[in-house]
Amino acid sequence: MPRLHKYLLIAFSLLPLSFQFPAQSLPTGPAIDAKVHTLMLRTHANGMAVAVIDQGKVTYVDSYGIRDAENDPLTTETVMYGASLTKTVFAYTVMHLVDQGKIKLDTPIAADLDKPLPTYGPDPIFPDKYGPYKDLADDPRWKQITPRMCLTHSTGFNNFFFIEPDQKLHIHFDPGTHFSYSGEGFILLQFAVEHGRKAQGLGLDVGDLTNAIFSRLGMARTSLTWHNGQHANVADGWNDQGQPQPHSDRKKPRAAGSMNTTISDMAKFTAALVRGDGLTPASRAEISKPSLHITTRNQFPLFQPDLPASEQRKDLYAGLGVVVFDGPQGHGFYKGGHDGQTANPMVCLEKSQR
């Protein structure tokens, strides 16, 4: 068995942008193969899966390398951890609720709840799923948080409450004023969807909502929670010491990143997303609309100071569940996802639906 090396060892790559190939042409299979093998050598990746979408249609899907320490092959039907690509799926799901009049992007979440947020919990439904909202009792700024702020990483929360030194939930800046990556914001919006006013059409299970979308798109091996049918062909990972890391069987749907999927399934979702399937034109446009300027140098570490205005990228904004930008090929959006053993980039171009 080959020696295992680096962090990026299973790259779950959705590349409608086509690896820096010329804008006027799509890469052929041999050209993609050559680029993938170069990238795998450079990153020491043991496995990689790739999809290309053009004009809103899946034009190429393939997989390379191995999926586990037993050298089993990675295939286009291998289940992989989608990580934060879940956030884009959740944003797409929320926009269905917006179209149905159940959620308003710019109305505070407080208006969707039957009682003040800090009065919820502790409760058996909370462990390992939602945040400790009682911690916000002395900070009234929770009342300002809207669904758009949750989807644009501008709630003021840390990425997750449990990485705070005191493991409590805090608001670090006035909501809506800065971009600072936060899975906790997505979890809050999930809470509002699942425990909001039933008279408003909320009180909905996010796992059920996403499963309905996956079923409509023919994504048979994708879900926000683990099911036994995924065991037969699943990808593990490797840490930065080259040690195999078993796939985590996530039991609770979490909008911030619990999705398991395959490259074939995720290609179907990405194609539907760039086409705007199932959404009104206005809601599809909201996803990739510049909602909040990103003024820091990097996404991590969190809570960075703003760059001087002259050094800020003028085109870089948070969209809903994505980051939007303008480049040589026009307006586009991006989402990445990773943990200590996998990495997943998705890059899409609006004009060519690529």
Give, region by region, the residue ranges found by the protein language model.
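Bacterial N-terminal signal peptides that target proteins for export
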Residues: 1-9
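Bacterial N-terminal signal peptides
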Residues: 9-18
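Sec/Tat signal peptide C-region and signal peptidase I cleavage site
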Residues: 21-23
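Short, conserved catalytic-motif segment at the N-terminal edge
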Residues: 26-81, 102-104, 125-126, 163-173, ...
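Short active-site loop at a secondary-structure junction
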Residues: 41-49, 70-123, 130-148, 173-184, ...
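Loop/turn elements at helix/coil->beta-strand transitions in domains of secreted/extracellular proteins
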Residues: 45-48, 55, 147-148, 220-221, ...
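Short, surface-exposed loop or secondary-structure junction motifs
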Residues: 120-340
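Short, surface-exposed beta-strand/loop micro-motifs that present aromatic residues
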Residues: 333-334, 342-351
